[in-house]
Each structure stands twice: as structure tokens, then as C-alpha cells.
């Protein structure tokens, strides 16, 4: 038995001429091949799944590696029209008897980003992730603190606005402030987060309606936050999504949610 997470990159892709023969659709065969090659190069994916044989420090033994997953599907929209598209998505199945405080979001996002950058110029605008929070156990504080220290090494004058949304069930109704406070605590003094007072700039998210977990038009049960982070990058978006997921857990959320982080206009 497995539980599943999913990550999707949103943005604009300008294909290189020499990669024009590659295609990608809902089944995503080309993207899957690119992503799997990259994952294998990093040592992050194995057809053997979540465990691998460790040879060091004495006799060989089977150990768990939270950077691996058991199986995956992938696809994307490479339409060449200059519009924001869901460029790449990948699902990852994880055995139910293996639970960690974090999901392999950074691993999956990195290989997706590398894959699409291999075939063209990419303007990355947003990220969404399906987070099965009910499956996570343990404390991610140390990891999130280390990520915060990494992003602290940036020019504070170049901070950027980011829109964050959470699609959750009735249990999170009215908990905007509690979640906001938990997000701010985890971001520290290098980033900002506030409950959105009005309409949120979601121009960095593709116009999809439920595909791969995200529905841009969904209104009911959506928490909205206006954030500022030290930089805009794939890694920074993953950090925001992970921080938000951990804040939701702290606020009592124990269900599957969809979290987005997307670049907002400076004037919004």
C-alpha cells in the first residue's frame, strides 16, 4: 500500500529548436523519460523503491532513504503560446509503512525543473503540491531552520512578492490567522506572510480546473496569504510550500491539502 504526493511546475516554456521533436501530453512519455534520467543521475530514484542496500560501515543492510520513492507518473503542457502552463508534473508513491516529517518535494521539483530547462528557456512562475499531511510524522523544525539559513544569504533589498494558497477541508475553516502565525514563525525575520485582505494575484498559476490536484477556480475552503521572500526560485517556492504544510500540521490539519506558491506582481 502507498500514499501519494504530487508536484507541478507552472511557467512559460520557449523550446530550443533542437528539442522541437520532443512531445509531451497528459501521458508525458518524453517528460517522464527526461525526469527519470535526471533522478537516476542524482541517485534519487530506484525501481527498487524506497529502500536500498547500504554497503558502508560493516555488513550490507537494507535501509530507508526518504529521498526515494516507489513509483511515479509524469506529464506536462508544452504548448508554445507564451502563456503560463502547467509545464511539468510528477506524482510519487511512498509506502505507507514509511513515514517521515517531510515529503520528497525538493527532489521531485528539482528533477522536473532540470528536465524542462534541458529542452528550452523557462520562466518559472509557480508551483503546486498535493500534501498528504495525515501521513507525515516527526518534527521538521531542524530541516526548515537549515533552509531558512540558506535563504538568509541573499540580498534583502531584492525580496519578491509571492502568493500562497491552501485548498483544504472544513477543518481549516476560520484558521487563517493561526496558520499565518505558524508560517511567520517558520519563516523567521527573512520573509513575511499576511492573510490576503482582497483578491490574490494568481497570474503565475496555469488556468487548470482540477487536473493533478489543483483547481485555479476553487473558492470554497481556500486559505490565501501574501508573502515576501528573499528570492524567487524553484527552491524558494518549495521552501514556502513546505513551511506552509508544516504550519498547517501545527494548526491541527491532518488531511490531504493542495498548496501553491506563485510569483505575484510587485504592484499587487
Predicted regions and their residues:
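Acidic, proline/glycine-rich low-complexity IDRs
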Residues: 110-150, 224-226, 232-268
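Intrinsically disordered, low-complexity segments enriched in Gly and acidic/Ser/Thr residues
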Residues: 170-246
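Short amphipathic beta-strand and strand-loop transition segments with alternating hydrophobic
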Residues: 59-60, 67-79, 141-153, 197-216, ...
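Surface-exposed beta-loop interaction hotspot
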Residues: 104-202
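N-terminal leader/presequence regions that precede the main folded/catalytic core
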Residues: 1-111
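Short glycine-rich, low-complexity/disordered patches
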Residues: 45-57, 117-133, 192-220, 250-268
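Short glycine-rich, basic-tinged beta-strand/loop micro-motifs
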Residues: 82-94, 157-171, 213-231
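Short, extreme N-terminal segment that most often corresponds to the first beta-strand
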Residues: 1-42, 135-176, 264-267
